């Protein structure tokens, strides 16, 4: 499941990045070569960038690739009960952060339903939508890990210390 999710997320991020690069390149060529550019390229690039960032954040969570300070946790591995309590506390804090981000993103989403972007005309609610979806997805993953009492996945962070 994780592998399929990672592939879909990587493809979505690559598509966003490729489209942004093409839009900016074409806009630069048109603007400096012909004196006129694509008005929607900046707005669409901004929207794609926001989506790409939150897709990446969501894809990084199950792999344990978010930045973490593991110095203390690595020392706690020798004390299983303390390590389990620290793991539960970390997951609860992640869940709290997701709730707060989702709450704020939902409020911005509702406000954005009535307004539209200036150039393209898409609903402004599309800008906070990836934050809402990402926080819900990460929150569900953190809740499942908390309920299952899964040990922390240090990802590649242990290689750096």
Q: Predicted regions span which residues?
A:
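Alpha-helical transmembrane segments and membrane-interface helix-loop junctions
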Residues: 1-161
